[in-house]
Amino acid sequence: ADAFITGLYTKYSNTIKVAKDIIGIRPEYKHFGTMHILNTKKGVFYIADTLINRHPDAEVLADIAKLAANSVSFFNDKAAIAMLSYSNFGSDKEGSPLKVHTAVEKLQKEYPDMAIDGELQVNFALNKELRDEKFPFTRLKGLDVNTLIFPDLSSANSGYKLLQALSP
């Protein structure tokens, strides 16, 4: 299955367990995640992982980004992926920024044509002029980022709900 839609009244954790047991995970992945799609005045944004992986490590983040890129292409769009953090390109070399940086390095090595970079703050991710001026080396240069990969479940879920609330 390429997608799985559940209702408002189903406990999410039960639904995910059933989906994993019955549908399974694609052979080329070890993990799976969720992605919300928001259609805003500034365009369509794909946000992951908003519901499943509480504290993903670099390997899980890499799978989430690959899954997101594949899902975005399913909608006839091309993913320009920002791997988000409170840090920009190694300005903090510990904790959450390090795992994001490690995931980006892995993906850039394995998929040299993938439009992905990070770790970076959301204001740089969504403002191409600011990002390109401050970080001219980025693989996202000149691109409008449309896919946001958050470092953990709390920030991803809060981020998509914030965008949803601000974009009637």
Regions found by a protein language model. Name each.
Residues A1-P168:
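Anion-binding alpha/beta catalytic cores of soluble intermediary-metabolism enzymes, centered on
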